[in-house]
Swiss-Prot record:
Cofactor info, note text: Binds 1 Mg(2+) ion.
Keywords: Cytoplasm, Magnesium, Metal-binding, Transferase
Gene Ontology CC entries for this record: cytosol
EC number of this enzyme: 2.7.8.7
Organism field: Rattus norvegicus (Rat)
Predominant cellular place of this UniProt entry's protein: cytoplasm
UniProt-recorded name of the protein: L-aminoadipate-semialdehyde dehydrogenase-phosphopantetheinyl transferase
Gene from which the chain derives: Aasdhppt
Length: 309
Protein backbone atom coordinates (compact mmCIF):
# COMPACT_ATOMS: atom_id res chain seq x y z
CA UNK A 1 0.00 0.00 0.00
CA UNK A 2 1.28 3.44 -0.92
CA UNK A 3 0.53 6.16 1.59
CA UNK A 4 0.31 9.78 0.51
CA UNK A 5 3.32 11.86 1.41
CA UNK A 6 2.94 13.93 4.54
CA UNK A 7 2.70 17.64 4.02
CA UNK A 8 5.70 19.35 5.56
CA UNK A 9 5.23 22.55 7.52
CA UNK A 10 8.21 24.77 6.88
CA UNK A 11 8.97 26.97 9.87
CA UNK A 12 10.68 30.18 8.70
CA UNK A 13 13.93 30.99 10.45
CA UNK A 14 13.76 34.26 12.31
CA UNK A 15 16.31 36.40 14.08
CA UNK A 16 15.63 39.48 16.15
CA UNK A 17 14.38 42.47 14.15
CA UNK A 18 15.20 46.15 14.70
CA UNK A 19 13.57 48.63 12.31
CA UNK A 20 13.22 52.41 12.25
CA UNK A 21 11.24 54.70 9.96
CA UNK A 22 11.71 58.48 9.77
CA UNK A 23 8.19 59.87 10.09
CA UNK A 24 9.52 63.40 10.43
CA UNK A 25 11.00 63.44 6.93
CA UNK A 26 8.16 61.49 5.28
CA UNK A 27 6.00 63.83 3.20
CA UNK A 28 3.48 61.42 1.64
CA UNK A 29 1.85 62.07 -1.69
CA UNK A 30 -1.92 61.49 -1.91
CA UNK A 31 -1.26 58.15 -3.65
CA UNK A 32 1.14 57.00 -0.91
CA UNK A 33 -1.16 58.04 1.93
CA UNK A 34 -4.26 56.42 0.43
CA UNK A 35 -2.37 53.20 -0.36
CA UNK A 36 -1.03 53.09 3.19
CA UNK A 37 -4.44 53.44 4.84
CA UNK A 38 -5.91 50.82 2.48
CA UNK A 39 -3.25 48.42 3.74
CA UNK A 40 -4.28 48.41 7.41
CA UNK A 41 -7.37 47.13 9.21
CA UNK A 42 -10.48 49.38 9.07
CA UNK A 43 -10.56 49.93 12.84
CA UNK A 44 -6.94 51.08 12.78
CA UNK A 45 -7.68 53.47 9.92
CA UNK A 46 -10.54 54.91 11.95
CA UNK A 47 -8.26 55.36 14.96
CA UNK A 48 -5.60 57.13 12.89
CA UNK A 49 -8.24 59.42 11.43
CA UNK A 50 -8.95 60.74 14.93
CA UNK A 51 -5.48 62.24 15.38
CA UNK A 52 -5.40 66.04 15.28
CA UNK A 53 -1.78 66.40 14.22
CA UNK A 54 -0.25 65.01 11.05
CA UNK A 55 2.92 63.96 12.84
CA UNK A 56 0.93 61.67 15.15
CA UNK A 57 -1.12 60.20 12.30
CA UNK A 58 2.03 59.50 10.26
CA UNK A 59 3.81 57.89 13.21
CA UNK A 60 0.86 55.65 14.09
CA UNK A 61 0.29 54.62 10.47
CA UNK A 62 3.98 53.79 10.05
CA UNK A 63 3.78 51.62 13.16
CA UNK A 64 0.86 49.62 11.77
CA UNK A 65 2.64 49.10 8.45
CA UNK A 66 5.83 48.00 10.22
CA UNK A 67 3.94 45.39 12.26
CA UNK A 68 2.20 43.98 9.20
CA UNK A 69 5.48 43.93 7.25
CA UNK A 70 7.09 42.06 10.15
CA UNK A 71 4.40 39.39 10.32
CA UNK A 72 4.11 39.00 6.54
CA UNK A 73 7.84 38.71 5.88
CA UNK A 74 9.10 36.95 9.02
CA UNK A 75 6.19 34.59 9.72
CA UNK A 76 5.17 34.07 6.07
CA UNK A 77 1.56 35.07 6.71
CA UNK A 78 -0.10 36.83 3.74
CA UNK A 79 -0.61 40.54 4.44
CA UNK A 80 -4.39 40.43 4.02
CA UNK A 81 -4.66 37.40 6.35
CA UNK A 82 -2.99 39.16 9.28
CA UNK A 83 -5.31 40.12 12.13
CA UNK A 84 -4.03 42.46 14.80
CA UNK A 85 -5.75 43.04 18.10
CA UNK A 86 -5.03 45.13 21.20
CA UNK A 87 -4.63 44.12 24.81
CA UNK A 88 -6.61 45.82 27.57
CA UNK A 89 -3.63 48.18 27.90
CA UNK A 90 -3.75 49.06 24.19
CA UNK A 91 -0.70 47.05 23.13
CA UNK A 92 -1.00 45.66 19.56
CA UNK A 93 -0.72 41.88 19.36
CA UNK A 94 -1.40 39.11 16.85
CA UNK A 95 -4.88 37.59 17.06
CA UNK A 96 -4.84 34.48 19.24
CA UNK A 97 -6.03 32.19 16.44
CA UNK A 98 -3.07 33.14 14.19
CA UNK A 99 -1.03 30.15 12.97
CA UNK A 100 2.29 31.28 14.43
CA UNK A 101 5.34 28.94 14.32
CA UNK A 102 6.87 30.84 17.27
CA UNK A 103 4.73 30.51 20.43
CA UNK A 104 6.82 33.16 22.20
CA UNK A 105 6.95 35.58 19.25
CA UNK A 106 6.94 39.10 20.62
CA UNK A 107 7.08 42.58 19.12
CA UNK A 108 6.77 46.13 20.32
CA UNK A 109 6.74 49.57 18.70
CA UNK A 110 7.39 53.12 19.83
CA UNK A 111 7.19 56.52 18.20
CA UNK A 112 8.44 59.85 19.45
CA UNK A 113 10.34 62.71 17.91
CA UNK A 114 11.08 61.98 14.25
CA UNK A 115 10.97 58.16 14.25
CA UNK A 116 8.78 55.11 14.62
CA UNK A 117 10.78 52.08 15.78
CA UNK A 118 10.05 48.36 16.08
CA UNK A 119 11.77 45.51 17.90
CA UNK A 120 10.74 41.86 17.52
CA UNK A 121 12.05 38.55 18.83
CA UNK A 122 11.01 34.94 18.11
CA UNK A 123 11.66 33.72 21.67
CA UNK A 124 12.13 36.75 23.93
CA UNK A 125 9.91 39.15 25.82
CA UNK A 126 10.61 42.58 24.32
CA UNK A 127 9.86 46.23 24.95
CA UNK A 128 11.13 49.26 23.05
CA UNK A 129 11.11 53.00 23.58
CA UNK A 130 12.56 55.94 21.67
CA UNK A 131 13.10 59.43 23.02
CA UNK A 132 14.28 62.59 21.29
CA UNK A 133 16.40 65.01 23.28
CA UNK A 134 14.68 68.41 23.14
CA UNK A 135 14.36 71.44 25.35
CA UNK A 136 11.29 71.63 27.62
CA UNK A 137 8.37 73.52 26.10
CA UNK A 138 8.21 75.87 29.07
CA UNK A 139 10.58 76.83 31.84
CA UNK A 140 14.26 76.10 32.32
CA UNK A 141 15.93 72.69 32.39
CA UNK A 142 16.43 72.85 36.20
CA UNK A 143 12.71 73.61 36.58
CA UNK A 144 11.87 70.70 34.29
CA UNK A 145 14.11 68.37 36.32
CA UNK A 146 12.42 69.53 39.53
CA UNK A 147 9.00 68.62 38.13
CA UNK A 148 10.30 65.18 37.10
CA UNK A 149 12.20 64.58 40.35
CA UNK A 150 10.15 61.56 41.46
CA UNK A 151 10.70 59.67 38.21
CA UNK A 152 14.33 58.81 39.00
CA UNK A 153 16.35 57.62 41.98
CA UNK A 154 18.97 59.74 43.72
CA UNK A 155 21.74 57.75 42.03
CA UNK A 156 20.18 58.29 38.60
CA UNK A 157 19.92 62.03 39.25
CA UNK A 158 23.58 62.04 40.24
CA UNK A 159 24.44 60.48 36.88
CA UNK A 160 22.19 62.89 34.97
CA UNK A 161 23.63 65.94 36.72
CA UNK A 162 27.24 64.74 36.49
CA UNK A 163 27.62 66.52 33.14
CA UNK A 164 28.69 70.15 33.08
CA UNK A 165 26.38 71.46 30.38
CA UNK A 166 22.57 71.34 30.56
CA UNK A 167 22.13 69.81 27.09
CA UNK A 168 24.22 66.77 28.06
CA UNK A 169 22.19 66.47 31.26
CA UNK A 170 19.00 66.53 29.19
CA UNK A 171 20.49 63.93 26.88
CA UNK A 172 21.15 61.60 29.82
CA UNK A 173 17.67 62.31 31.22
CA UNK A 174 15.99 61.03 28.05
CA UNK A 175 18.32 58.05 27.86
CA UNK A 176 17.19 57.00 31.35
CA UNK A 177 13.57 57.65 30.42
CA UNK A 178 13.78 55.40 27.35
CA UNK A 179 15.28 52.60 29.47
CA UNK A 180 12.48 52.78 32.02
CA UNK A 181 9.76 52.89 29.39
CA UNK A 182 11.25 49.93 27.50
CA UNK A 183 11.01 47.80 30.66
CA UNK A 184 7.47 48.94 31.48
CA UNK A 185 6.35 48.23 27.91
CA UNK A 186 8.02 44.80 27.95
CA UNK A 187 6.07 43.71 31.05
CA UNK A 188 2.89 45.31 29.66
CA UNK A 189 1.67 47.11 32.78
CA UNK A 190 1.01 50.49 31.21
CA UNK A 191 0.44 53.57 33.35
CA UNK A 192 0.70 53.39 37.11
CA UNK A 193 4.07 51.66 37.51
CA UNK A 194 6.20 53.48 40.08
CA UNK A 195 9.27 54.49 38.09
CA UNK A 196 11.47 54.95 41.17
CA UNK A 197 11.30 51.18 41.66
CA UNK A 198 13.62 51.01 38.65
CA UNK A 199 17.22 52.16 38.81
CA UNK A 200 19.54 51.95 35.83
CA UNK A 201 23.31 51.85 36.10
CA UNK A 202 24.07 53.11 32.61
CA UNK A 203 27.26 52.18 30.80
CA UNK A 204 29.00 53.51 28.84
CA UNK A 205 28.18 57.14 29.60
CA UNK A 206 28.94 58.13 26.00
CA UNK A 207 27.44 56.29 23.01
CA UNK A 208 28.36 56.44 19.32
CA UNK A 209 25.66 56.84 16.69
CA UNK A 210 24.78 53.56 14.96
CA UNK A 211 26.32 51.25 17.57
CA UNK A 212 24.38 49.04 19.98
CA UNK A 213 25.46 48.69 23.60
CA UNK A 214 24.36 46.17 26.22
CA UNK A 215 26.26 46.98 29.39
CA UNK A 216 23.58 48.88 31.32
CA UNK A 217 22.27 47.09 34.41
CA UNK A 218 18.80 47.19 35.99
CA UNK A 219 18.17 47.32 39.72
CA UNK A 220 14.53 46.65 40.62
CA UNK A 221 13.38 47.30 44.19
CA UNK A 222 17.03 47.36 45.27
CA UNK A 223 17.97 44.02 43.65
CA UNK A 224 19.86 43.56 40.39
CA UNK A 225 17.68 41.91 37.75
CA UNK A 226 20.13 39.70 35.89
CA UNK A 227 17.49 38.03 33.72
CA UNK A 228 16.87 41.32 31.93
CA UNK A 229 19.17 42.70 29.23
CA UNK A 230 19.03 46.12 27.60
CA UNK A 231 20.20 47.14 24.15
CA UNK A 232 20.85 50.86 23.80
CA UNK A 233 21.57 52.82 20.65
CA UNK A 234 21.46 56.27 19.10
CA UNK A 235 19.78 56.38 15.70
CA UNK A 236 21.05 59.91 15.21
CA UNK A 237 22.44 62.74 17.31
CA UNK A 238 19.18 63.35 19.17
CA UNK A 239 17.29 60.01 19.36
CA UNK A 240 17.95 57.37 22.03
CA UNK A 241 16.45 53.89 21.67
CA UNK A 242 16.28 51.28 24.43
CA UNK A 243 15.23 47.65 23.93
CA UNK A 244 14.41 45.49 26.97
CA UNK A 245 14.86 41.71 26.55
CA UNK A 246 13.97 38.73 28.73
CA UNK A 247 13.26 35.07 28.14
CA UNK A 248 9.65 34.06 28.90
CA UNK A 249 10.86 31.65 31.60
CA UNK A 250 12.75 34.46 33.31
CA UNK A 251 16.25 33.27 32.38
CA UNK A 252 18.85 35.49 30.79
CA UNK A 253 19.11 35.83 27.02
CA UNK A 254 22.36 33.95 26.42
CA UNK A 255 23.58 36.23 23.64
CA UNK A 256 23.44 39.30 25.88
CA UNK A 257 25.86 39.28 28.81
CA UNK A 258 27.05 42.27 30.80
CA UNK A 259 30.14 40.48 32.06
CA UNK A 260 31.28 38.64 28.94
CA UNK A 261 30.29 40.92 26.07
CA UNK A 262 30.86 44.58 26.77
CA UNK A 263 31.47 45.54 23.15
CA UNK A 264 28.72 46.90 20.91
CA UNK A 265 26.58 44.16 19.36
CA UNK A 266 25.78 43.91 15.67
CA UNK A 267 21.98 44.16 15.98
CA UNK A 268 21.77 47.64 14.58
CA UNK A 269 18.58 49.34 13.45
CA UNK A 270 17.70 49.12 9.78
CA UNK A 271 16.30 52.43 8.51
CA UNK A 272 13.30 51.75 6.29
CA UNK A 273 11.79 53.99 3.62
CA UNK A 274 8.16 54.06 2.51
CA UNK A 275 8.73 51.55 -0.30
CA UNK A 276 10.17 49.16 2.28
CA UNK A 277 7.08 49.56 4.46
CA UNK A 278 4.68 48.57 1.67
CA UNK A 279 6.88 46.02 -0.13
CA UNK A 280 4.59 43.15 0.93
CA UNK A 281 1.38 45.18 1.28
CA UNK A 282 -1.97 44.02 -0.08
CA UNK A 283 -4.75 46.67 -0.04
CA UNK A 284 -7.71 45.44 2.02
CA UNK A 285 -10.27 48.25 1.66
CA UNK A 286 -11.49 50.49 -1.18
CA UNK A 287 -9.73 53.79 -1.77
CA UNK A 288 -11.15 56.64 0.31
CA UNK A 289 -10.08 60.03 -1.14
CA UNK A 290 -11.72 61.87 1.76
CA UNK A 291 -9.06 60.46 4.07
CA UNK A 292 -6.44 62.48 2.20
CA UNK A 293 -8.55 65.61 2.69
CA UNK A 294 -8.55 64.86 6.41
CA UNK A 295 -4.77 64.52 6.34
CA UNK A 296 -4.37 67.86 4.55
CA UNK A 297 -6.57 69.47 7.18
CA UNK A 298 -4.42 68.22 10.02
CA UNK A 299 -1.35 69.46 8.13
CA UNK A 300 -2.90 72.93 8.02
CA UNK A 301 -3.48 72.88 11.78
CA UNK A 302 0.15 71.88 12.21
CA UNK A 303 1.38 74.78 10.06
CA UNK A 304 -0.86 77.28 11.84
CA UNK A 305 0.59 76.16 15.15
CA UNK A 306 4.09 76.80 13.84
CA UNK A 307 5.26 73.16 14.07
CA UNK A 308 6.68 70.65 11.65
CA UNK A 309 6.03 66.92 11.45
Amino acid sequence: MVFPAKRLCVVPYMEGVRWAFSCGTWLPSPAEWLLAVRSIQPEEKERIGQFVFARDAKAALAGRLMIRKLVAEKLNIPWDHIRLQRTSKGKPILAKDTLNPYPNFNFNISHQGDYTVLAAEPELQVGIDIMKTSFPGRGSIPEFFHIMKRKFTNKEWETIRSFNDEWSQLDMFYRHWALKESFIKAIGVGLGFEMQRLEFDVSPLSMDIGQVYKETRLILDGEEEKEWAFEESKIDQHHFVAVALRKPDGSRHQNVSYQDDSKPSQRQFTILNFNDLIASAIPMTPEDPSFWDCFCFTEEILIRNGSKS
